[in-house]
Curated annotation (Swiss-Prot):
A Pfam cross-reference name: Defensin_2
Organism expressing this protein natively: Apis mellifera
Gene3D superfamilies attached to this UniProt entry: Knottin, scorpion toxin-like
Gene Ontology terms describing biological process: defense response to bacterium; humoral immune response; innate immune response
Protein name, per record: Defensin-2
Signal sequence coordinates: 1-19
Taxonomic lineage of the native organism: Eukaryota, Metazoa, Ecdysozoa, Arthropoda, Hexapoda
């Protein structure tokens, strides 16, 4: 019974860490917005460069910071990162400075 509970918790953790990874990048049309009249803009504000693409926010530290704990019976320090990398079809990985680094 203890093994089943630990296995269920591990499956829930793997599912939660894989759910935060975007699976598909949007390739549809991107429509331009109209230009704002520059005379209404305050001189102290900086405009964002329109040539830089907006990248999605990635939370890479969850598997290494939150899941990096060990007890007397169980330690999942680098194994959570390795499972996350295997789910991304990579060859495993490890935690470095709180960030999960996957092997190629």
């Amino acid at each position: 019974m203890k093994f089943f509970v630990l296995f269920a918790i591990l499956i829930a953790i793997v599912h939660a860490s894989c759910a935060s990874v975007p699976k598909v990048v949007y390739d549809g049309p991107i429509y331009e917005l109209r230009q704002i009249e520059e005379e209404n803009i305050e001189p102290d504000t900086e405009l964002m460069d329109s040539n830089e693409p907006l990248l999605p926010l990635r939370h890479r530290r969850v598997t290494c910071d939150v899941l990096s704990w060990q007890s007397k019976w169980l330690s999942i320090n680098h194994s959570a990162c390795a499972i996350r990398c295997l789910a991304q079809r990579r060859k495993g990985g490890s935690c470095r400075n709180g960030v999960c680094i996957c092997r190629k």
